[in-house]
Amino acid sequence: MAKIRIFELARSLNMTNPDLLDRLKEMGIEAKSHLSSLEDDIVEKVRQGVFRTEVEKPEKVEQKRVRSNVIRKRRQPVKSEAEPEAEAPAAQAPEAEEVTAPTAEEAVPEEAADADVSAKAETPTAPETPEEAEISVSEEAPVEEAADQVPPTDEAVDPAEAAPAEEESSPSRKKAKAKKHQAAKIIKFPDAPQRLSNKGVLEVVDDTAPADSPAAPAAATPAGEKDKKPSRKDRKKRGKTESVETEEAVPVKKKGVFKRKEIVEGVALYDRTRGRMRKKGKGGAKVPGGAKTQITTPKAIKRKVRINESISVAELAKRMGVKASEVIARLMGMGVMATLNQQVDFDSAALVAAEFEYEVEKASATEEELLELNVEEDQGNLKKRAPVVTIMGHVDHGKTSLLDVIRQSRITEGEAGGITQHIGAYKVNTANGEVVFLDTPGHEAFTAMRARGARATDIVILVVAADDGIMPQTIEAINHSRAAGVPIVVAVNKIDKEGADPDRVKREASDHGLVPEDWGGDTMFVNVSAKQKLGISDLLDMVLLQAEMLELKANPDKKARGVVIEAKLDPGRGPVATVLIHEGTLSVGETVVCGIHYGKIRAMFDDKGAPLDQAGPATPVELIGLGGVATSGDDLFAVGDEKSAKTVSENRQQKQRTEDLARKDSISLENFFEKMQEKEEKVLNIIIKADVNGSCEAIADSLQKFSSGEVKIHVVHSAPGTIIESDVTLASASNAIVLGFNVRPSPKVRALAAEENVDIRSYDIIYDLIDDIKKALTGMMSSTFEEEVLGRAEVRELFVIPKKGTIAGSYVLDGKIERGRPARLLRDGVIAYNGVIGSLRRHKDDAKEVASGYECGIGIENYNDIKPGDVIECYFLREIKPEL
């Protein structure tokens, strides 16, 4: 059902918001403010109530002449139909020939002060005798804006209160009394000044006529009474009494024209100023309290807040004009624990703003619009591209050697330890077309690298050694490929080696869902030998056949998009990123966004180091020009202008800062005890520096696995690049050790480390790094002890020896009793004492140990309360070294 707000309904009814709210309150309709909504049935009810003609009995207006130039007008309650006829002669003026034109002074609210009111004067025929002179009351002419017309109050004045007022005859006393209740005099010139139409006849303007009633000629009614419909302002101010008096007319230069002065008494003045100028003080008259101060609300067009992707709590509160504590309270109600300077996202800000009746708009284009992510691709622009193939498998199964044969290169010879510890991208020209290869590490520490390779590829070549079979990292590679939905081609390597069994590989692969085609499955198996260069062409044919089945296409004429394979910080060139272009063409000089960084491409190189001006789809390149070291796996987008790139980068950086703050641990009542226990843990602080960003991630992830309940690894800092002085300073401040992987510190840095007593360790092979850290953590852990019972002896007789105490003559029941070992005294199965065996004798000779079946004398250090029948149990604690 459609709804309408109160301020819209008031506008359609030509009413003010307070008037309509009062009207709704009288009708029993609950409404909090003018921004509240009403249902259609309630709106129709309100419209009928406003426009319905209200017929009320006419009120008698009693006019009495106080003196020759003052007329007092009072409203009297209607008692019966016979009373107007009885009191009609009282309204006639006894002396009409001395009447001058007075000005009717009434309390006018602020809304009516500027209303354009024109009085339509009637000129009746002058009576022949003074007794026939009557006061004719003319109705007020209609005005254009009915909402601004406010007549005086309709409440009748009690005769007891009116009597003292009639006794006042002095104009000066009357003025003084009026000034006592007013804050200032308001002088107003009427638009149409009144004139004396005839001698003895006075025209009095009656403001009691409703604003929406048409002007009608004044009829000579008894006592000057006429019909009147109370307006909305009358009902609002019912219960308040204001005396309306006319003061002495002030003549001006023109003859017959009189100037009117208006006295605004205290009650009217209070209503007009909404309580701001209420009369106070010891001698001030008591004035009834007015309406409460209305809280102003901005217009609908001003109740909009324009923000970007996020905004701080303080800034949001400032733009809405509310207290920040109120915004924080609303966020807490939504389950968001935010501080004053914490950033909230667009959706959270919109929900909070709605609580304060504000609307949130995005100040700039969204990231999807700036990067053109939702643009539909025209199928006619797609062209065939080269397949991207990732080589995966267990460590030392021959992945890089196989790639060397395909590329006719010698990558393996330059690798430390003969293992791949980076992810590489290469483009190879074969007889059947181009193929892009991604070489991933096989060590268990490089899980994240293998996952990125599986997501960025079209086909996976799973290398399995024929003599080794399926290994843990092989299974992990299978899972990564399945998660990415990438087809797998199995290359059974080392078939020339002794003990090779390709059928064993097929059986084990079938157990993991890779069923060979010759066994009725859909997985291609190729037997190869990288060392003997056997089966290489067959493997490439299978890969290209699989690529044709996938129908790989891309649009080279659009803005480039790609993914970061690897990133590093080069000392001479700055941040360098290895990027695989997925679609579009990337050119030197273009502005790109990559993760939280952006920049203009200064140079590009292929996998062999040759410079490039452009790079099309399925092309691996090294690019220089980013503002920082990108994170492996970040997407790269070419942007039309630098301003858009900067906007996207700043928004992403702000999101990352917000996430980093959210990840920081905070103390609460729930986790206070846990935090206190963590302080007792032994923490090993580490700073990791490596040649590429992927190695930093791999090392950090591998070391975090060693954290346990007693020892914990805290990575203080991790970044690609060489070890510099700031790393040593940070390590000294945080009591950390510096681990370098494929990087070396300079002599100056080594001297600073020696001065600051900072331990710097450099490694080329990740095995050695992980083993050293594991040993260090093991040494930090406390050993545990396990109790082992040696033997038990029963006490049968007691001997008291001076200077040595009580000696228990005992019989060894089982095991053996050794001197100096811990022992416990058991009495009726309950431990009576824990101590150490101080003396052990057999036949008056000291003995080191006594075996079972023999008698001996046992003395317990510092304990003599031994009784016959007790059992002495001898044991020792075995130390168990901790393991990770």
From Swiss-Prot:
Annotated keywords: Cytoplasm, GTP-binding, Initiation factor, Nucleotide-binding, Protein biosynthesis
GO cellular component: cytosol
Stretch list, region G3: 439-442
Domain tr-type G: residue ranges: 384-553
Positions of region (G5): 529-531
Molecular-function annotations in GO: GTP binding; GTPase activity; translation initiation factor activity
Region (G2): 418-422
Gene3D superfamilies: 1.10.10.2480, P-loop containing nucleotide triphosphate hydrolases, Translation factors, Translation initiation factor IF- 2, domain 3
Region (G1): 393-400
Chain sites annotated for binding GTP: 393-400, 439-443, 493-496
Localisation per UniProt entry: Cytoplasm
Region (G4) residue spans: 493-496
Region listing for Disordered, in residue ranges: 58-248
Comp. bias intervals (Low complexity): 87-106, 207-223
Purpose: One of the essential components for the initiation of protein synthesis. Protects formylmethionyl-tRNA from spontaneous hydrolysis and promotes its binding to the 30S ribosomal subunits. Also involved in the hydrolysis of GTP during the formation of the 70S ribosomal complex.
Protein family: Belongs to the TRAFAC class translation factor GTPase superfamily. Classic translation factor GTPase family. IF-2 subfamily.
Name recorded for this polypeptide: Translation initiation factor IF-2
Organism of origin: Desulfosudis oleivorans (strain DSM 6200 / JCM 39069 / Hxd3)
Lineage: Bacteria, Pseudomonadati, Thermodesulfobacteriota, Desulfobacteria, Desulfobacterales
Gene: infB
